[in-house]
Amino acid sequence: MDERILEFIKNEQLLSWAMIDEKGVYTASAFYAFDEKNLAFIIASHEDTKHIRLASENSSIALNIAKESKIAFLKGVQAKAEFKMASKEQMKIYFSKFPFAKFDKSAKIYALELFWLKFTNNALGLSKKLEFYKK
């Protein structure tokens, strides 16, 4: 993955993600840590939430991270990923970034494993996009 994309991802911590429900698309937001080795966003949530139930039923999800409202400075990521339970190593990554999350014993840790990503950075030029495909 291009270093400029990784730098953007590592400097942010909030994403929006979408999954399918019975009427179409459903969205949620989550704080994340990033697993560089496995190229996965790591999030925490509760099993009984609608977004976790939906992602468990259909693991193909989309996500978005956007920063800056001025068009000339817009930076952001659009991505497709697979929803999974986090590994023990990913749990360590998440808790090292958000140690207070350990206190919520009912929350589970999940991974959104990337398979496609598009990075927009208008500071590079309005038509310049960087894409990543997992091999």
UniProtKB/Swiss-Prot annotation:
Superkingdom of this entry's organism? Bacteria
Q: Which InterPro entries does this entry report, sorted A to Z? A: Split_barrel_FMN-bd, UPF0306
- Family annotation (HAMAP family): UPF0306
Q: Give the family this protein belongs to, as stated in its UniProt record.
A: Belongs to the UPF0306 family.
For this entry, the protein name equals UPF0306 protein Cj1449c
The species this protein belongs to is Campylobacter jejuni subsp. jejuni serotype O:2 (strain ATCC 700819 / NCTC 11168)
Task: Name the lineage.
Answer: Bacteria, Pseudomonadati, Campylobacterota, Epsilonproteobacteria, Campylobacterales
